[in-house]
């Protein structure tokens, strides 16, 4: 019985720890669980932090347009997009996927594991709501742009990805280059911004238009 209690306490600590840690990420340069795991295994890992204010203004706009167009309007979960994804999965008879917000991806990348299992999703939802509550939107976006996997050889964050793909800093990306990085986010190992295929180029064209649309809501100070 004592062992069961100890295990329950340990489980509670593991589950609650992210809620205690998250508010402290208002500052600093946090790393993702995948970055930490790669470092522990001795696998290649490149990340150089760049502040949101220093990035090309086209970069956050492209990523928000591509990944989470309602980022500035929801509170961590895009319930409308979630319902649509569930309805589409039911109609098509396929497994539910997609509809993850940038905040959910930050929750997953900082505190959880990769994969699509139900347990991770169940932990991710309330944690995303909490992160949205304790961190400002610009900070959530800044963290995401610095911890997302964005290259085939362990490149994490937009600065390392920009150097790898274009040989320049994320501070000086053009609209097209920013959109190319946004286009590879779902699968940066198979997709390439450095040598983009027709699918990536087509997506990039779409994201350039979306990023420049006046209807895209912004909730961060843009670096003009």
UniProtKB/Swiss-Prot annotation:
MF terms (GO), sorted A to Z: pentosyltransferase activity; peptidoglycan glycosyltransferase activity
TM helices/strands, residue ranges: 3-23
Keywords of this entry: Cell inner membrane, Cell membrane, Cell shape, Cell wall biogenesis/degradation, Glycosyltransferase, Membrane, Peptidoglycan synthesis, Transferase, Transmembrane, Transmembrane helix
Cysteines paired by S-S bonds: none
Species assigned in the record: Bradyrhizobium diazoefficiens (strain JCM 10833 / BCRC 13528 / IAM 13628 / NBRC 14792 / USDA 110)
One GO CC term on file: peptidoglycan-based cell wall
One Gene Ontology biological process: peptidoglycan biosynthetic process
Lineage summary: Bacteria, Pseudomonadati, Pseudomonadota, Alphaproteobacteria, Hyphomicrobiales
Pathway(s) of this molecule: Cell wall biogenesis; peptidoglycan biosynthesis
Name the UniProt record assigns to this protein: Biosynthetic peptidoglycan transglycosylase
Catalytic activity: [GlcNAc-(1->4)-Mur2Ac(oyl-L-Ala-gamma-D-Glu-L-Lys-D-Ala-D-Ala)](n)-di-trans,octa-cis-undecaprenyl diphosphate + beta-D-GlcNAc-(1->4)-Mur2Ac(oyl-L-Ala-gamma-D-Glu-L-Lys-D-Ala-D-Ala)-di-trans,octa-cis-undecaprenyl diphosphate = [GlcNAc-(1->4)-Mur2Ac(oyl-L-Ala-gamma-D-Glu-L-Lys-D-Ala-D-Ala)](n+1)-di-trans,octa-cis-undecaprenyl diphosphate + di-trans,octa-cis-undecaprenyl diphosphate + H(+)
Keyword Repeat: no
């Amino acid at each position: 019985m004592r062992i069961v209690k100890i295990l329950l306490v340990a489980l509670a600590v593991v589950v609650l720890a992210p809620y205690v840690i998250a508010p402290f990420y208002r500052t600093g340069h946090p790393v993702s669980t995948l970055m930490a795991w790669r470092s522990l295994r001795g696998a290649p890992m490149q990340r150089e932090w760049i502040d949101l204010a220093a990035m090309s203004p086209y970069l956050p706009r492209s990523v928000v347009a591509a990944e989470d167009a309602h980022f500035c309007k929801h509170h961590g979960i895009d319930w409308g997009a979630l319902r649509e994804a569930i309805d589409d999965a039911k109609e098509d008879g396929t497994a539910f996927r997609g509809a993850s917000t940038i905040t959910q991806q930050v929750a997953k990348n900082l505190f959880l594991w990769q994969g699509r299992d139900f347990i991770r999703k169940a932990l991710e939802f309330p944690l995303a709501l909490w992160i949205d509550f304790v961190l400002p939107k610009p900070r959530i976006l800044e963290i995401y742009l610095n911890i997302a996997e964005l290259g085939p050889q362990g490149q994490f964050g937009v600065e390392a990805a920009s150097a790898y793909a274009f040989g320049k800093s994320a501070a000086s990306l053009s609209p097209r280059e920013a959109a190319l990085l946004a286009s590879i986010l779902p699968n940066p190992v198979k997709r390439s911004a450095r040598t983009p295929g027709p699918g990536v180029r087509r997506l990039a064209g779409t994201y350039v238009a979306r990023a420049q649309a006046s209807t895209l809501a912004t909730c961060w100070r843009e670096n003009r």
